[in-house]
Structures are given as C-alpha cells and as structure tokens.
Amino acid sequence: MKFSLKSLLTIAAAASTLILAGCGEKAVDNNKVKIGVMAGAEAQVAEVAAKVAKEKYNLDVELVTFTDYVTPNAALDDGSIDANAFQHKPYLDKQIADRGYKLAIVGNTFVYPIAGYSKQIKSVDELQDGARIAVPNDPTNLGRSLLLLQQQGLLKLREDVGLLATVRDIVENPKKLEILELDAAQLPRSLDDVALSIINTTYASSINLTPEKDGIFVENKESPYVNILVAREANVNAENVQNFKKAYQTDEVAKAASEIFQGGAVKGW
C-alpha cells in the first residue's frame, strides 16, 4: 500500500494532536460536570444547584459525596471530579502549600459559621476550671476555633498569630481549659464527653443543630471563611464549570440553603 507525502503529513499531524491532547486535560463534554460535595445538608443544597443548572444551561450535574475534608481535593487533583464545593480559602491555601495541588477558585458559595455547642452549659460563664473543649484538628479550622475562643475571652493567643493558630500560640488560659483536637466529623459525638465543642455548620446540621438556634456563641458572619467552588487551574474557566457556578449563585439556591440550614448559611456572592 502506497501513501502520498500529503497523506503521510496528514497522519503525522493527527497523531501529534492525539499525543498533545493526552498530555493535558481530557476532552471536555460541556453538557456534563462532576462536582464533589460533603454528604448531608451541603449535598442537598448542591442538588438544587444541579436542578437549576439543568433548567438554565442544559447541564447534567453528577454529585459525588464525601464525608471528610481530605479526599475531595485529592479527587479533584487526580481528575476524578471536575470541581468541588466544600472548603474555604484558608483551607485551600494550606492544602496547596502542603500538597502542591494546582487548584483555583471558581467562585464563592456560602459562609457556614462555626459555633460553640454544649449539652452541659448554656453560657461561657458556666465553664468550670479545667473544662474540656473539643475543636477541629485540621490546621485552618483549628485556628478558626481558637480565634473564636479568644473572641469569647476564654483564652489569649500571641499577637499577630494570623489564621493558622495552634495550641502552642495560647499565651493565656485563665481557666486552664483542656483543648482536645478531634477530626471534624467526630465533633458532634464529642458533645456527650466534653463541656463545649466547636463544630462546623455542616457537621452540626447532621445532628439538627444550627448556629443561631443552638449555638452558645457564633462566629462573626463577616469572617474570611466563605466557602468556595474550586476547580483545577486547567479547567477553572471551562464552560461546564462556569455554568455550574452561575447555577449555584442564584436566588433559588440561596433560598434553599437558608431553609436547609435554618438560617445557618449566609450567601457569599
């Protein structure tokens, strides 16, 4: 079988295109998108966004649920999902610094304020000396919790500590409180064993607690911890990802989040 020079050049060009395509992002179907979310109430909010995306952009959204804070970014990094919606910027920045992920912010979702919850006390004034307080153990939410405890006058952190405070940064602890660092998912169960637990709204909602109704004290809603939609740097501007963002940032989704979280979700866009 003979090939003309023109045919050979055409074949070579096609082969080169296939090789180059294999080195970057996979071919994108802009009518489909796979989004990672936390199981529970956040997934319910995302389901509303998925419905809006289908109605407004003919976008088929597959939601992939997670129960921890580590796996969603790993799944995004390896291409298992197209984007995720579960974290705030300080957490993302820490993950990028620690793991080298090439991830980027697509847009804001909601502020889910953390709060102090208890089965033993009704105000911080009732905390006994040596009381045990449970806080999240991931670096950003640990710092977030310690700053909240400082705002309540329960301890003092060293000056200019920033957002990533640790227990080593505590310089005053007049009640000699014992700070227990636990996985965030374990915090709701810790309420039976500690005087006070600082819990993210996502996990608090799993046991029907809301900041406004049940929190002894609540984080300021003007915090830097607005949650974000995140994609890879390579697909952050992809049509399917951008259309999901536009579907998420709608009044329909904001209304649903307010109802699902009983006022514990504040629109971040």
Swiss-Prot record:
The record places the lipid (S-diacylglycerol cysteine) at C23
- Where's it found, cell-wise? Cell membrane
Q: Which domain of life is it from?
A: Bacteria
Q: What PROSITE patterns does the record tag this protein with? A: PROKAR_LIPOPROTEIN
Q: Which UniProt keywords apply?
A: Amino-acid transport, Cell membrane, Lipoprotein, Membrane, Palmitate, Signal, Transport
Q: One GO BP annotation here?
A: methionine import across plasma membrane
In the UniProt record, the signal sequence range is 1-22
| Disulfide bridge positions per record | none
Lipidation, kind N-palmitoyl cysteine: residue numbers?
A: C23
Q: How does it sit in the membrane?
A: Lipid-anchor
* Record keyword Chloroplast present: no
Q: What does this protein do?
A: This protein is a component of a D-methionine permease, a binding protein-dependent, ATP-driven transport system.
For this chain, the family text in UniProt reads:
Belongs to the NlpA lipoprotein family.
Q: What is this protein called?
A: Probable D-methionine-binding lipoprotein MetQ
